[in-house]
Amino acid sequence: MARHTAKSHKIRKVEILVIQMKIYATILDNNVKYNYRKAVTQYMNRFELVVPCHFGLEAVVKREIYDLGYEITRVEDGRVSFEGDAEAICRANIFLRGAERVLLQVGRFKAATFDELFENVKALPWENYIPKDGRFWVKKASSIKSKLFSPSDIQSIVKKAMVERMKRSYHIDWFPEDGAQYPVRVFLYKDEVMVTLDTSGDSLHKRGYRLATSKAPLTETLAASLIMLTPWHADRILVDPFCGSGTFPIEAAMMAANIAPGMNREFTAESWTNIIPRK
């Protein structure tokens, strides 16, 4: 009887151990699934961001992006690209002094005909960026050394392709376009097409502090970039005897006071709640 009781006790302990192992395995599996979903979400929410700047000043903007903690993915004439998340969109618009604007790259491909342009734009996942009530239009198209050279035709084809893609994705034939604005900018260079969403809206040289401008003013982004190329520091005096509207002194004063250039203005992407979540 005692031997039977001891045996039953051992069996019970084994059963409990098996149950504990199953529970542990379930928890581990759920953690793995959670971490996987988290990793996928973080990956899916990362974007290729393109920062246009003045020609010859790419190194200045590149250093600014590095200082914000992001890795550069590409440097071209008048453009610097880096990878970032929704927070990077906000930080770049607010803190970059030499950038003209911040663009979110939707796609990049080769196109030598309008059919190729249409099909490639249509293949882009626009539903991941623009909601069904979003107001979208091609704000600007530029073409350099490309077979497709008419900006107005490029704008028209890209808009049509976007509509066709979104009609299929949202299963609707008409878009109210009464929601947030999603301006599109298209660039062609040697038949390579880059399609982007403009997260900035007005050019970033519009800081929001100037009520009036003088004749032939120096842009704030150019002034800030030139200052950053000099050995000037905040503890030094800056003298500009031909200051005009005072762009150099104002930009230097903002640097010395550590005032972000985009603090006093708004950005288009502020209303993109599908991309930039509200906390």
Specify the residue positions occupied by each region the protein language model found.
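S-adenosyl-L-methionine
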Residues: 50-57, 61, 83-95, 188-233, ...
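Short, positively charged and aromatic/hydrophobic N-terminal segments
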Residues: 22-40
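Non-catalytic nucleic-acid substrate-recognition regions in nucleic-acid-modifying enzymes
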Residues: 2, 43-182
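Conserved S-adenosyl-L-methionine
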Residues: 218-279
